[in-house]
Amino acid sequence: GYGDRNFLRF
C-alpha cells in the first residue's frame, strides 16, 4: 500500500 512505500521511501 501507499503507507508501506512511504515507510520504505525513508
UniProtKB/Swiss-Prot annotation:
It comes from Macrobrachium rosenbergii. Coiled coil: none annotated. The lineage of its organism: Eukaryota, Metazoa, Ecdysozoa, Arthropoda, Crustacea. One of its GO terms (biological process) is neuropeptide signaling pathway. It is found in: Secreted. The modification Phenylalanine amide is found at F10. Signal peptide: none annotated. Keywords: Amidation, Neuropeptide, Secreted. This is FMRFamide-like neuropeptide FLP7.
